[in-house]
């Protein structure tokens, strides 16, 4: 990488921008030699590359393919360039598809392929973040500027974020309920004024051996409803319900409070690489905390409480749910929360095993796109919550 060679993108594009199929990639290469230099040429390459490694030890297999490579000459020499600043604009367009022969994989049962003519949709940019996994993957899109030199080229490389459009309403963004199956309880007594209070240490010890009639017990569990189709950056509401049948006894129940929470996406990635006799496959998992905080709000029994703000309002890039010929990405959702009662905390964990992360741009269109999907889903009376993103064929 050379310090006197840089890549800049035209507004509104930046390294954080999320490109989509057919988007223009506009920018410029800036060459800033500190002294006179002989330059053969200056060229720029726009390339999409797909790399996977699966298995371990002697069974490990690697696979890579260049989805596309577009090169342009920005300056043609040879020419002796004086110490100054030179700017060369470039323009590329993201392809919508690329040609690939899926027959290199001998088994399509895991990754069913609908594009038998060899035209594949571009998959979203993503990569394995750790070397400790048994498999690795990287789907990358990059702009590389280069000046050939006898003893090592000058170059500068910038990676771009890319995600395809979602074109089908499956799954629709309907919420789904789930609950922590564990039962929790609190023992308490009522004061002379009828106010619940925790048992003292001595009362708790005696209760273990013999139940006292003035002691009360309340059993409770937590249920939650959350969206199963998600765009990071859209402010979804989560509905919490503290469940208990003991309030029907007529005794005064203690007050509960929902305090700390963690909202986590459970990312699951299946990676494969072809071999001579067998295709190697690896499964990777990672937990991504998308929201956490402290709410400190009263949680009524058997009545839903709608909580806003758990999902982040500022979008960040994450690969959407997708299935391609060598990488498959899916998600689950997990909510961890703390419920406090009479000075004691209970930890809850609620899990939705399958949610879908929608692709969306970071700058605009998230709210409009989701409202359109929600409206269309209601009109069509859709309630299917399975499936993966569909791409234009």
Where are these regions (language model features)?
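C-terminal beta-sandwich interaction modules and adjacent acidic
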Residues: 1-393
